[in-house]
């Protein structure tokens, strides 16, 4: 069985972070492992508190995973401080990690900040050069490219600038501010658009986490980057279309929408 590692924060309400990643990786057919960068006290309405892992404990987690079950792909999500980013980058280089997907999480769906200001530059310097692909949304893409993004032409310019500057593929997600759900992949000097239907569902907590971990899962299984993005977008469309409605704010998706079998059946007695 192929394996994938999520390096990310814990979401106490289960819709984003490592909880979303474990569900997504499992539903996409790989064995999920986790390294926790931070504990968050959050729900669908916002983030109440963040407790970071220490750099030393983060290193212990990474070593424990890589020395026993080497991951076929790595997804990196919320990493809130420069010290933690440096530990991750050093350990990934040390072990020769492959198929690295970086979701540069800066702000939660609820609007709460998840990254310290100085950590953004450290992420750019340390993690982007190691990445197979990064998956910024429009606001994150503006920060990484130093360009305003308001159209598809802007997306193409920004993705090219990010990819050429940092030497990684870029999946720039068009769901924020651009009036469709189309995403742009810039890889190997080529542009590829992925069309997506906009689903009228306000419950989008954890969509970025889910997409990036689905891409990592498919890379782990040997699909090309383009195929992995296509399959990941199909999966997230299914999870959104299931119309799960939980919580008082932007609720989670139904990650297990395609779960079948005896143990998934509801009690009808």
What does each model-identified segment do?
Residues 3-6, 26-109:
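Conserved N-terminal subdomain of the carbohydrate kinase-like
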Residues 7-13, 191-205:
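Short pre-catalytic strand/loop immediately N-terminal to key active-site residues, enriched for Gly-Thr
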Residues 14-30:
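N-terminal basic/disordered segments at the start of proteins
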Residues 19, 142-143, 201-225:
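Short, small-residue alpha-helix embedded
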Residues 29-33, 192, 218-232:
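Phosphate-handling active-site elements
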Residues 49-52, 226-269:
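Charged C-terminal helix
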Residues 117-191:
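Conserved phosphate/ATP/ADP-binding segment of small-molecule kinases
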């Amino acid at each position: 069985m192929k394996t994938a590692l999520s390096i990310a924060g814990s979401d106490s309400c289960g819709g984003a972070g490592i909880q979303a990643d474990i569900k997504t990786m499992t539903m996409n057919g790989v064995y999920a492992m986790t390294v926790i960068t931070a504990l968050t006290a959050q729900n669908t309405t916002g983030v109440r508190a963040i407790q970071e892992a220490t750099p030393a404990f983060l290193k212990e987690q990474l070593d424990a995973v890589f020395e026993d079950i080497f991951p076929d792909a790595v997804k990196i999500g919320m990493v809130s401080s420069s010290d933690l980013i440096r530990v991750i980058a050093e350990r990934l280089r040390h072990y020769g990690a492959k198929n690295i997907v970086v979701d540069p999480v800066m702000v939660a769906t609820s609007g709460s900040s998840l990254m310290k200001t100085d950590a953004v530059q450290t992420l750019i310097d340390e993690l982007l050069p190691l990445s197979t692909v990064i998956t910024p949304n429009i606001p994150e893409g503006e920060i990484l490219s130093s360009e305003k993004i308001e159209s598809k032409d802007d997306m193409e310019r920004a993705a090219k600038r990010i990819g050429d500057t940092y030497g990684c593929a870029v999946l720039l997600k068009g769901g924020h501010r651009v009036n469709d759900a189309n995403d742009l992949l810039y890889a190997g000097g080529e542009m590829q658009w992925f069309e997506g239907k906009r689903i009228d569902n306000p419950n989008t907590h954890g969509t970025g986490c889910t997409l990036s971990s689905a891409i990592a899962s498919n890379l782990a299984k040997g699909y090309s980057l383009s195929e992995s993005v296509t399959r990941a977008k199909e999966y997230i469309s299914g999870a959104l279309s299931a119309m799960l409605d939980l919580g008082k704010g932007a609720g989670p998706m139904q990650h297990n929408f395609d779960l079948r079998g005896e143990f998934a059946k509801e009690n009808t007695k």
